[in-house]
Amino acid sequence: RGDKDIFTVHDILKARGEI
């Protein structure tokens, strides 16, 4: 389904410093 996708997006946002 899309659990890993959500984690990937969260990781990207964290790397960008948005979260």
From Swiss-Prot:
GO terms for molecular function: tryptophan synthase activity. Keywords: Amino-acid biosynthesis, Aromatic amino acid biosynthesis, Lyase, Pyridoxal phosphate, Tryptophan biosynthesis. It is an enzyme of class 4 (lyase). Tetramer of two alpha and two beta chains. Belongs to the TrpB family. The beta subunit is responsible for the synthesis of L-tryptophan from indole and L-serine. This is Tryptophan synthase beta chain. It comes from Klebsiella aerogenes. The gene is trpB.
